[in-house]
Amino acid sequence: MRANALLEKRRMKALSHYFKGYLKETILGPLFKLFEASFELLVPIIIARIVDTIIPHHDKNHLYMMVGLLFLLAIVGMFVAITAQYFSSKAAVGYTRQLTKDLFKKIMGLSKEDRDQLTTSSLVTRLTSDTYQIQTGINQFLRLFLRAPIIVFGAIIMAFTISPKMTIDFLLMVVILFAIVFTMSHLLNPIYAKIRQATDRIVNMTRQQLEGVRVIRAFGQVAAEEQEFAAANQDYTDLQIKAGHLSSLVTPLTYLVVNGTLILVIWQGNLEIGRGLLSQGMLIALVNYLLQILTELLKMTMLVTSLNQSFISAKRITEVFEKDSENLATELIQSESAFALAVKDMTFTYPTAAEPSLSHIDFSVNAGDFLGVIGGTGSGKSTLVELLTHLYTPQEGSLAIFQNQHSPKTLGEWRSWVNVVPQKAELFQGTIRSNLILGIRDEVSDNELWRALDIAQASDFVSEKEGQLDAKVEAFGRNFSGGQRQRLTIARALVRKAPFLILDDSTSALDYLTEAKLLSAIHEELKEVTLVLISQRTNSLKAADKILLLDRGHQLGFASHDELLKQNDVYRAIHYSQHQEEKEA
């Protein structure tokens, strides 16, 4: 228990440095709220004086002066409150802006393993909802952490100066109300934590369903997905209802205690007035102080609730910061080889998986060769790409790449040697030029861009666009067809010169003729580049020097197209299923 408390304290301290640069606002916000509270505490005393002294004596001049003073306090209080809100908001927004900036930078530096563990949907929620919750909590804290206690305890002190005997009722009421607030807070904390987890689950499901909507419809899984989403949504609803039921008890319980105290104060006050120990104005002042305490305790209830949610959000964010960032300067074990790619008895299992995704894979590729990779769904093709780009490291065996017989010295150098065109063609809003030079710091000439477009078989449609290289690209490349997007992403990879080029099923939207021209151009123009093409089509791999056949993580073959066709039953079955006419012949 103590260890957990120390961990939470360390986590909160880790986020406190974001107040740096906003120290003035952090001090002035609560300070102005303190002034506002002081002005409010004077109002009941002024009203009591009007009732007890001015009205009985019909002193109009004095009455006008007191009413004017009340208006002055109201105007000054409004100005002070607005000023306090400005400073509090500035500190909260500034804090969150820097926090969000650093959190985004941290997320971008996480390893693939950590991103998979935290999940994309959870990271999005932490970057948006959690940071906003922290901003709300800070804003409310700076506005209320001095104001509410000052008014509560100030009202008790002022009540004591009026009637020490009746102050006991005030103290008893405050103790009971604090007990209600903190009991509810203790009950609500774990529920709010579960609500955050339920939110992550819904966001993750929504993201998956939107991205895979075509597949879901194609396989008739719409009803099943709707049922799964409804179940997750119901869990979220149940948690919100449970939290709502508990939090809704706070207000009626508070009013019950306060109104009970109010009846007691009025009853005792009436007796005190009858004995001549208390005036009517003083009783009115006591009632006003009682209502002020009620208002501030309700605000404190909201503050405690907001802070609890903020602490939960802060905990989720610090979990991200506690992850080690990927260090591109990490030194790798050096080795030498005549091959460009050497895989020796490699086995890899994902951290959350029970079975290996790749098991005992063994092959080697010469520099400038064309390696084809084929296999069914779940065979391990995408896993191989993640290992080739060093997003993961195999638990057994080894995988190494070489240039001029030497392996890369650092993780950053390894990544710079490998260009990957992913399955999903991603284009960003901007221009064709801005997409082609994405991530490249050195200046790239137009000739180099056109050469990459020529090789990728994209120069024909780019030249027809208005503005050509400076033609507009909409978000996600929506103004291009699937095949055009794939060719542009391949061209982008070619602009960033590297000795290895991996096409992860990134020619699937191209017709056979265009694909053949593209692969031929890469072979002719980039003779030193080692090409790895992952494809579902055997026709795409005919020209490959070697083809790696995978099935459920196991290597079933490693040979040329013709050799596999003669020797491997699985490859032959795949090929003939795609070319029925050859089988019949």
Range-by-range predicted roles:
Residues 58-63, 158-172, 242-315, 320-321:
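Helix-loop-helix
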